[in-house]
């Protein structure tokens, strides 16, 4: 009998705690959206996804005076080496570096043309 009462107290208590936690979480989300914390957090995350041109050059091991063909050659070499070893993280870094330099070269060719 005592075990049955103890079990029912534990079940009821855990239900109350679960409801309180979900309600507190909802309230925290509402407060965060009012103050703009959620927007600031997403902006911080978005800023972290892009790399700078200097970092992209460093990843690929090229200089500012390197031709586009040289950049593509370095990209292909590094991408294939990391594909063989199975390093998806390094492959994505190399790919992001190429994308960054590609946009930089496109901007420089459109302004010089």
From Swiss-Prot:
Keywords: Membrane, Mitochondrion, Mitochondrion inner membrane, Protein transport, Transit peptide, Translocation, Transport
GO cellular component, as recorded: mitochondrial inner membrane; TIM23 mitochondrial import inner membrane translocase complex
Regulation: induction: Induced by heat and salt stresses.
Start and end residues of each stretch annotated as J-like: 55-104
Targeting presequence: 1-48
Entry's Gene Ontology BP terms: negative regulation of defense response; protein import into mitochondrial matrix
Disruption phenotype: No visible phenotype and normal sensitivity to pathogens, but higher expression of pathogenesis related genes PR-1 and PR-2 in Atpam16l. The double mutant Atpam16-1 Atpam16l is lethal.
Annotated localization: Mitochondrion inner membrane
Annotated tissue distribution: Expressed at low levels in seedlings, rosettes and inflorescence.
Lineage: superkingdom: Eukaryota
Topology in membrane: Peripheral membrane protein
Classification via Pfam families: Pam16
PANTHER family according to UniProt: MITOCHONDRIA ASSOCIATED GRANULOCYTE MACROPHAGE CSF SIGNALING MOLECULE, MITOCHONDRIAL IMPORT INNER MEMBRANE TRANSLOCASE SUBUNIT PAM16 LIKE 1
The protein's role, per its UniProt record: Regulates ATP-dependent protein translocation into the mitochondrial matrix.
Family: Belongs to the TIM16/PAM16 family.
Protein name: Mitochondrial import inner membrane translocase subunit PAM16 like 1
Gene, per the UniProt record: PAM16L1
């Amino acid at each position: 009998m005592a075990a049955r009462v103890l079990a029912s107290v534990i079940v009821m208590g855990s239900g109350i705690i679960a409801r309180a936690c979900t309600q507190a979480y909802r309230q925290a989300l509402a407060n965060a959206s009012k103050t703009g914390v959620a927007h600031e957090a997403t902006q911080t995350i978005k800023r972290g996804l892009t790399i700078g041109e200097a970092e992209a050059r460093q990843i690929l091991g090229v200089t500012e005076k390197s031709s586009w063909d040289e950049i593509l050659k370095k990209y292909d070499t590094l991408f294939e080496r990391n594909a063989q070893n199975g390093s998806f993280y390094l492959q994505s870094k190399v790919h992001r570096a190429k994308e960054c330099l590609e946009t930089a070269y496109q901007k420089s060719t459109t302004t010089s043309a």
